[in-house]
Regions:
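Active-site beta-loop-alpha junctions enriched in small/polar residues
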Residues: 31-35, 60-62, 91-95, 115-117, ...
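C-terminal helical cap(s) of enzyme catalytic domains, especially alpha/beta-barrels
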Residues: 127, 210, 224-238
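Conserved, mostly hydrophobic/aromatic
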Residues: 40, 47, 58, 102, ...
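Hydrophobic faces of well-ordered beta-strands that scaffold small-molecule active sites
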Residues: 26-32, 55-57, 78, 86-90, ...
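Conserved anion-binding
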Residues: 36-39, 81, 97-101, 105-194
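A structural motif
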Residues: 49-54, 107, 154, 214
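Glycine-rich, proline-tolerant flexible connector loops at the mouths of alpha/beta enzymes
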Residues: 55-72, 162-170
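NAD(P)-dependent Rossmann-like dehydrogenase/reductase catalytic/cofactor-binding core
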Residues: 2-22
Length: 238
């Protein structure tokens, strides 16, 4: 992907409004990265059939993380097929270059990394100016205090519970301390941003994240491989 912003078709289906921040149960957002890459539309249908309202879209550039996934053209192609809330996670070196493209493609939320090579405050402002919800993400070895300057201006804080780049990795339990820190900070500030976790989330680790304060769980491999996906989701949201 280059720095230019491609022209994407306008969405033809009105997206479902995202759930509010004050929810009695957590949100499960399956990662499309774990679906069949030859049939993303089927992966979307699987999420809908499980009764869920969000899909997590991992965007990787091969620079910020050692893998490449897909870009705004794929997001735009999926947008008319579903009303799912598009939770787009930009694992890009220069995410500010792609805000307009993903907004036009149909994203409702863009999350960028605090470690990426960009002016974080300006990028978050650009996301909001585009009419989207803004999120800030951190890697497992990042000090959660780096997120403090941005928590009052985001709708979501994302703790990576694996090192980003590939699905199917093992959960890193030390990140639970970062989740607890951010949850306590949210309470201290009286904030309402969502606290999301991504990586190695399954029936066991998802409950650990919930207990630590997370309310938005990105599940990939565990969701798509579950023999009963509705039961899997119910186990995380009970």
């Amino acid at each position: 992907m280059g720095p230019s912003s491609p022209t994407s078709p306008r969405r033809s289906a009105k997206p479902r409004p995202p759930p509010g921040n004050a929810m009695p149960t957590p949100v499960v957002a399956p990662s499309l990265l774990a679906a069949d890459h030859g049939d993303f539309a089927a992966g979307i249908r699987t999420i809908e059939e499980a009764g869920l309202g969000w899909v997590h879209l991992d965007i990787m550039d091969g620079h910020f993380v050692p893998n490449i996934s897909f870009g705004p053209q794929v997001v735009a192609a999926l947008r008319p097929r579903t009303r799912l809330h598009f939770d787009v996670h930009l694992m890009l070196s220069h995410p500010e270059r792609f805000v307009a493209a993903f907004a036009q493609a149909g994203a409702e939320r863009l999350t960028v990394h605090v470690e990426a090579d960009h002016d974080v405050a300006k990028t978050l402002a650009a996301i909001k100016d585009a009419g989207l919800r803004a999120g800030i993400a951190m890697n497992p070895d990042t000090d959660p205090r780096r997120l403090l300057p941005y928590l009052d201006s985001v709708d979501l804080a994302l703790c990576m519970t694996v090192f980003p780049g590939f699905g199917g990795q093992a959960f890193i339990p030390t990140v639970l301390d970062s989740i607890r820190f951010l949850a306590a900070e949210r309470t201290r500030r009286g904030g309402d941003f969502r606290l999301e976790v991504d990586g190695g989330v399954n029936a066991e680790t998802g409950l650990l994240c919930r207990a630590a304060g997370a309310d938005t769980l990105v599940a990939g491999t565990a969701f798509y491989k579950a023999p009963d996906r509705r039961a899997f989701v119910a186990g995380l949201t009970a």
